[in-house]
Each structure stands twice: as C-alpha cells, then as structure tokens.
C-alpha cells in the first residue's frame, strides 16, 4: 500500500465498500457525536468523511487534532445508512472507518477559517493567502483559471498558432501607463523596463516570417488598481497574425472566445458569432460608453434639438453653448413615488452631476420639473424620439458632448441595474471599431494618440497628409463582454513612412521615434507583412466566468489595492550595499506636514 494514499479524497464510491483504503489530506471539519468522532478529510479533489469510534486506538489521536492539520488515515470503506447519505458530496454514500491515523503536520490556531462561508477582511485573506486558497470557492476559481488557460492553449494551437515567449527585460515604450523599471548593474544609470505588453516583439516575429503567434503573456503596468484591473501584473492571450484584415482577426478569435465562454460559462447564453460591430461614435451615442453592456436593453437618444431655444432655460443655454442633451428611458417608472426620483437625484449628485432631470409621460401629458417649462410639442418629440410610452419616465444628461455622453452611460447602467433589466444569465459580446486615431489633450491642447500608437490609420498616408487629424479613424478595435473591455487590438502600421508621419502628427520627431522604436522601425525597412492581432485579458475573462466582483478573486497571489504583497512583504527596502552596487541613491519625497 502506498505510504500516503491509495485514493484521493474525492474518489471513493459505494462500489468501493469493503475495501481497505488510505487517504491523506487536511482536517476540514471535526464533529464529536458522543460515541463517534467524525472528521471530514479534504484534499485537492474532494472530501471524505472518516469515522473514529470511541474506545478505538485512533480515537484519542483524532480528538486532539486541530482543523487544517494534515493526516493520513487508513481504514475500511463502508456504505452509509440511507438516512445519513450526504447528497451534496460525490463521496456522500460512503465513509472511511479509521483503523490507523498518522499525523503528518499539525496546524496552529487559524487566523481565518477554511471551512464554511464566513467572510474575512481582504487584508487578512491576502496575508494568509495560502489558507485562503484552501477555501472551496477560491480554490475552485484558481482551478477554473488553470483550465481556461489550458483550453486556450489547445484552441490556439489547433488554429495554427505557435506559442512563443518574449523578453521580460526590455526597453520602455509609451503603452499608456508607467513602466516598472529595473536598474542595470552592468550599465550604471541605465534601466530595463518590464513589458507593458509584448507589442513590439510580437510584431517583430511577424516581420521575421512567423505567420501566427500567441502566448499567455505576463504584462506589467505601474497603475492604480480597479475592480477589473490588477495593480502590477496581469496576463493576456496575446496573439498576432500576418497578411490579415480586421475582419480576418475577428473571424479567427470569435470562435475561440465564444467557445471558451460556452465551455466554462455554466450554461449561460453566449452571443453567437460573428459578434456585433459597433462604431466608437455610435457606442458613445447609444450606450454612453466605448465598452457597452449589451445585456442592458436601454438605449440613449440625442435630444439636443428638442431643447434648442426651448422654454427650459438650463438646457437651452447648454445647447446654445455647443453642448448636447441625451435622454435615457426608464420603462414603467412613471408611476413610481417621488422618493424614487429623489434618490436618483441624490445619486447623480454623488457622481458629480448637478442632478438628474426627468420627464414623466402620464396619461394626461408630460409631468415633472422639466415638463413645466417645456413646450408640449417638444415633450412629445422627446417621447417619440426615445420610444417612450405612457407610464414611462425619461431622464436627461446635458453638457459638453463627451461629458454628457459618459454621464448618460452611467445613468443607463444605473437604471438598468436598479430596474432589474440586466440578464445575469448571458454573456453579450461586441466589437467596438473605428476608434479615432488622435485626440486633443485637454490640458496641453496638443494632438496625441488616442490609443495604440502602432495602429494603421484608415486611409493610410493619404489620410495623414490630407485630413484633420481629429477626423482620422484607426484600424483599431476593442472586444467587450458584459460591459468589460477584454482587449484592445489593431491592424498594425507596418510601413516606416506612414509610422513616421503618424508620430510626427502626435509631436514626435523622427530622431525621437528612431531612438525609442528604432528596433521595430528598422525591421520594417527590410520587408514587413501587413499584420494585426489582439490580446484578450485572461484575468478578466476568468473574473466574468467565475462571476466575481474583482480580479483578486481569480488570481492565486494578487497584490492588494495599494500594490503590496502582504504575504511576501513586497515592496521592501533593500540594503545600502545593494543600492551602491546598482549605482542608485534614494531621494524620498518630503513627509507630509502634520496638522
């Protein structure tokens, strides 16, 4: 018999009754029923109930065990009585009557309980992550992540992609976030950067003649934490393809993503591919976001003209100043009590808005603060434009075009959630396309890249030379699921002349471009294929599949929201001798003044 186990703790069934088995695992729960002591023994695979009869040689040893001690139990498998069968466990028809028990490792008093559903502060969970990972839900999430990654590897390989690894120590690049820098000991005063993405390397692989690349790529960005963004590092399904159009990229990855969510989505509905394509401008207009949640049926309507020169002075003034007014319908809320509308007004103020105006379409006409000062014909035009019916209400967002669009999107999400309109049993995918190539920096007034600087502009060099930069669209796209951006991607700018001109418009001289991107730019001078790709976030996909509120619930050892590893104690000071070896000196910011 094996020293530690003949079976795992999830393997034994009624058909095994009568055999002698040996199990090893952790003491999950211990229950004393007078003449019998029960221990639920847990390992990676499941739980088996072990029975220790009073008076037996093993009873005293079992009685002294603390939860989470590691033991090996040898005994006879017996069927449970019908009234003691546990249908919640795959092993629930049997139990192991212990004959010997060996303690492999004892556990101290636990700082957090592993068994049960008790909640603990996240700081405590992260400090004792090795215990937290034993808990059923988190353990299941991490296994889901592992299975998702294995599935993605198989799918990409089956579709002709080759897995490559790209450098972790590389040069800094403007990916939109701060780099993590690594000082060079051999080259004092110079630094490597951890890659924000394998962007340049995967493009260089296409230039090198490899047709289809992928990897489960680690990416490093020194940016603040959000529910859907982990500080420090994250992983993405990074892929690139040669000789492809935008539609080729979509057609290749849609069945991978759709198939993944069908495989691991627990029976929830998944958008049938091809996924909808929504232009960026249309997304901002209809959904108030470039990552719309299509499970929400509410659509935003532009009603600017209904308020131009109208009797409602506040909105008329905004429109006269170049602003816009967007309307968000709220079906069936016209009869709601005043408190419903007051609470939404309070919420809007908490979001930084002045309030949330509305019109109620009652059987005897339009009602509410706005309707009192708005001509009836204009109110009726709003009702028709929004598709509202009698008994509905319509809410409004007004201001500068982008501000009004985004706040209308926030209102749409709030109403969809509060009114129970969002179907939690679906995964709704879409592509956002036709992103602007450039935007104006509000602080400096300069033209800057709006997203990825390596995207091919629609219209190529002719567009760069002949169009207002703010009107140029890029062959750039995002894949969105349930309001979560899974990835950005693009057809790449593979021509040096187009790239240099694109960077020139954004304020980069040729010398600076050569200095920062000379490796890739030089490679393009020796024959580069048209190519494109994307990089769906693994962490975000698993978060959606596991129905978790934040990424830390699907990462084995995440940093906390302040970018700290509480378990390993990172970041941490380093000895002065090490700093000297690296030719570094620390200049700390001044301590904040007290009082």
Curated annotation (Swiss-Prot):
What does the UniProt keyword field contain? Aminoacyl-tRNA synthetase, ATP-binding, Cytoplasm, Ligase, Nucleotide-binding, Protein biosynthesis
Sorted alphabetically, which CDD domains does this protein's record hold? AspRS_core, EcAspRS_like_N
User: Which domain of life does this protein belong to?
Assistant: Bacteria
Q: Where is this region: Aspartate?
A: 199-202
Q: What is its main location?
A: cytoplasm
Q: Which GO terms describe its molecular function?
A: aspartate-tRNA ligase activity; aspartate-tRNA(Asn) ligase activity; ATP binding; nucleic acid binding
Q: Looking at the UniProt record for this protein, which Gene Ontology cellular component terms does it annotate, in alphabetical order?
A: cytoplasm
Q: Where in the cell is it found?
A: Cytoplasm
- EC? 6.1.1.23
Listed binding positions for ATP are: 221-223, 485, 537-540
From the UniProt record, list the reaction(s) this protein catalyses.
Answer: tRNA(Asx) + L-aspartate + ATP = L-aspartyl-tRNA(Asx) + AMP + diphosphate
The biological processes this protein is annotated with in GO are: aspartyl-tRNA aminoacylation
User: Which amino acid positions bind L-aspartate, per UniProt?
Assistant: 175, 221, 451, 492
The protein's matches in InterPro entries, at most eight in alphabetical order, are given as: Aa-tRNA-synt_II (IPR004364), aa-tRNA-synth_II (IPR006195), aa-tRNA-synth_II/BPL/LPL (IPR045864), Asp-tRNA-ligase_1 (IPR004524), Asp-tRNA-ligase_1_N (IPR047089), Asp/Asn-tRNA-synth_IIb (IPR002312), AspRS_core (IPR047090), GAD-like_sf (IPR004115)
> Which family is this protein grouped under?
Belongs to the class-II aminoacyl-tRNA synthetase family. Type 1 subfamily.
**NCBIfam families given for it?**
aspS_bact, PRK00476.1
Quaternary assembly: Homodimer.
Function statement:
Aspartyl-tRNA synthetase with relaxed tRNA specificity since it is able to aspartylate not only its cognate tRNA(Asp) but also tRNA(Asn). Reaction proceeds in two steps: L-aspartate is first activated by ATP to form Asp-AMP and then transferred to the acceptor end of tRNA(Asp/Asn).
Q: What is this protein called?
A: Aspartate--tRNA(Asp/Asn) ligase
Give the species this sequence originates from: Acidiphilium cryptum (strain JF-5)
